Amino acid sequence: MRMFRESKSEEKKSPSSQTAGLFATVPSLKDIMIDRLIEQLGGIAELNKQVVRDPRLWGAINERLTQHFLLLVVQGKQGQVEAMLKVNPALILFARGDVTDYSGQTFKNISAWEYVLWAYDSHMYRMLFNYIPKEQRPLALQQLIDLETNGIAYTLSEKVMNAEREAEETRETIIREAHYDFSPLIDALQTYVTNVERWSFEECVEHWRKKVGGAQCMVPVHVGNEYCYPDRSFDPIPRFNEKNLPRRHNFYNYVSGADESWFPLSPAGLGTNFAIMRGCMRAVAGACWRVGRQWACNDLAAITALREVRQSDLIQLKEQLQNPAPESAPSTSKTLRSKNP
């Protein structure tokens, strides 16, 4: 449920920014040293282990580890996230930083726990829950309460054309909300279902590609994973209560005639040339210029159901945090029994 939304737009059009950008790409001495350390240790996972062994290193490389960890979280790479947590579970609640997701939304000073709660990514937060020590769960509850009370602000950067200057500019919109809002995608699908049989071919194509596809560009990764769930269509409507969520985002593009990936986004792909549908296709999701009414109805019903299930999941999580079981083990309810696929 979206609680509130504030937005304002800022246009960045500083000619000198191009010159400054040249120097922004030059790594600092600190970054060079950390890169060398990662190379010697054999990867960021080993760096994470070394930090735990020698806490004196934490201050020097905290930012790099946090950035890497948060990026894995927003990209839905659950297996890699869990690998880091097995060594350093403090990353869940206490590591804060700035991170930009696939949609171009930048969250500042956010924890991994706050992000997955905002995104309604129940599969990810179930896994994170299992790594939060019992004595730290009141803090996990407080972060959830703060999120629901105050929301979280993020910045969406978009490229827009300035007609007067005949030049492309970056527009930044600041949005504050408690959770990811399913409404733009649901509304776009509903509008399509309502009008597809009376619109012209061109109107159908325009709305499907730009409105439905545009809304799909903004979904958290787990929503794309549900679209691309292997061997499961949206007809009948899934229950969305599987223990494991395959972190796949591949689909067949009927426009290009090739298998493609939802993420990362392509400027000339989703939201521009096509939108993705699942409908009654069991094997795989598909991308196309337009679909028939029934296919869109299937997707509309499924995404509406997904929103309801994920909202219910979060209510159950909050209840469990507010009323912890006497034993230290997490609840055995279906809501908090997920292991990473």
UniProtKB/Swiss-Prot annotation:
Keywords: Coiled coil, Plasmid. It comes from the Bacteria. Residues 153-179 form a coiled coil. Residues 319-341 are annotated as: Disordered. Residues 319-335 have a biased composition (Polar residues). This is Uncharacterized protein CBUA0006. It comes from Coxiella burnetii (strain RSA 493 / Nine Mile phase I).
